[in-house]
């Protein structure tokens, strides 16, 4: 089901405006049955089902202004703006022990991770804090993470949605200009995005060592 409402305007034979609002409800999306009892023997081979539901909505706006100074010289200015949101409505999820592990009702593109509470300042603080078994030996200067479920250890159960934004930007925009004189044309265009979260993890200054920033 999709609703699309659009408006096109032209003013003074120079300014054109196009605006659109869309609202799409997608259903019958093919996915694995996650809420499937292991007792049925399908733990490693979960059946497929058309139970997925996703909502998408947003707006699109474009503006163009053209000014003719002479029959040989004219200028164009243009801009565009797009804002979109979405969320999972149904994923056939199992009943998780912690409500923050569910994806239903949350954006498709979001960022999950551990909640940082500063840095460890001493070995004594490490010894008196929840155990962090995240692949390396914890030392003073390492990041201290929150024990969200209070079980005395930091593991995957403590990962939560730390940002409603993911790698897909919710906002995209652009600005451009063209100047035309006879057979010559000059143009510039700028574009950008916003409401996006990326994890900067491709470059690690400490390699695979066990050291941290306070030891370099």
For each feature predicted by the language model, list its residue ranges.
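Short, glycine/acidic-rich beta->alpha junctions
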Residues: 1, 55, 165-176
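Conserved active-site-proximal loop/helix segments of enzymes involved in bacterial cell-wall
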Residues: 30-35, 156, 204-206
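C-terminal beta-signal and adjacent terminal beta-strands/loops
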Residues: 26, 85, 178-216
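Short, surface-exposed charged micro-motifs
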Residues: 6, 135, 176
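Conserved small-residue
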Residues: 52, 66-167, 207-216
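Aromatic side chains
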Residues: 21-22, 114, 120, 145, ...
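Glycine- and acidic
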Residues: 43-47, 159, 170
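Extracellular/periplasmic, surface-exposed regions of secreted and cell-surface proteins
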Residues: 1-111, 179
